[in-house]
Amino acid sequence: MRSVLSLALLAANVVTAAVVAPFDYSGYKVIRVPTQKDNVKEVQRIITDLNLDTWKYPKSEGQNADIVVPPSQISSFMERISGMNIEMMHEDLGLSIRNETSFEAYSAGYAPDINWFKSYHSYQDHLSYLQDLQGLFRTRSEYVDAGKSHEGRTIPALHIWGSGGKNSKPAIIFHGTIHAREWITTMVTEYMAWSFLSQYNKNADITSIVDNFDIWIFPIVNPDGFAFTQTSNRLWRKNRQPNPNARCPGRDLNRNYPYQWVGPGSSSNPCSDTYRGAQPGDGTEIKVHIANMKKIAANKGIAMFVDWHSYGQLFMSPYGYSCTARPPTDARHQELSRIFAQALKAVHGTPYKTGPICNTIYQVNGDSVDYALEVLKVKLSLTAELRDTGARGFVLPADQIIPSGEETLAGTVAMLKAVIQG
């Protein structure tokens, strides 16, 4: 393998995307301001007055504000927050991104092993890796082109089964990278796919899980946005679908599902990172994913859906749209969340908080978890925010990929064992 810069790794697919010059974050800082009752309104005003981007916006006291500050605003920002406690997440965001995006180029046909998880990778290399991984286990897996993104990219999936054969068991569905900048989710979902395949008939717990469930893993739910983060803007979140009569492209795919679509947990502003779209379910990729989930459900049903995100170290249950409503299966969701968090922590000591989405992180409208539970009638619908809690945020160093994969696999195995046991 040879080291190359991500900007040289342009996708080989021919797509109808406009060329956008790479955004340079050199000199930008990411600063955390913990909020309290006496400063949360002022922090909100500072963000608005200086027109600053945030990784985490403080909607109420006690929440952290993770703020991206450009070089031109650093002096004004530091003056405004004088006297407040702060934590420096990235002294130079551009340098952090350059360190993170020194990819290891992947040679197609390579026998996948743990070395894949020592680096982040280009979109095209992910496609090659997934096909090579499946090629090692042809009798109990398939690589699936699940559909096309708005710009024509493949939405890849791995379908894994055990002794009962293909489509013979209730399904488990894992989604990663619905938000383009959350690269660790791509790698962790692939780590689980690699483990389910390579450890079958070697690890008793994994063998039992694969024999009891039909497993579908979609590591890159939002391929256009993901590719855009690698060539143009590392911190892009949405898809790349144009919005009529608006200068800002993209919708937040996790605000676009057609259930409880309108509310304070999403935005009607096309320039917002949480823009819900013009109509419920109008995202190209959402149409693909809904069609796939319905097709999977038509076999033996869906036992569990998990949407993997970053960052925050959280494992959460429905609902996102309401902070007071609870599903009838709330107790079971909470029990499994605790099992996941306890088993995960036992690996590297990483603490996770658990609870309903709205109460644990923030209110969300039009999200995948609520849609899967209430519309598709998935039995168990959950979501995670992977490492970290904000020391590095979305730009997580590559040396955290393997430990993130190890602990997430342990939590997932423990949780699925509990599902099997009933």
Curated annotation (Swiss-Prot):
Active site residues per record: 385 (proton donor/acceptor)
Binding sites annotated in the UniProt record for substrate: 179-182, 237, 254-255, 310-311
UniProt GO BP: proteolysis
Cofactor: Zn(2+)
Cystine crosslinks: 248-271
Keywords: Carboxypeptidase, Disulfide bond, Hydrolase, Metal-binding, Metalloprotease, Protease, Secreted, Signal, Virulence, Zinc, Zymogen
Propeptide: 18-112
UniProt-listed Enzyme Commission number(s): 3.4.17.-
First-tier enzyme category under EC: hydrolase
Co-factor binding details: Binds 1 zinc ion per subunit.
Domain Peptidase M14: from-to ranges: 119-419
GO molecular function, one term: metallocarboxypeptidase activity
Regulation: induction: Expression is up-regulated during infection.
Protein name, as recorded: Probable metallocarboxypeptidase A
Annotated gene: MCPA
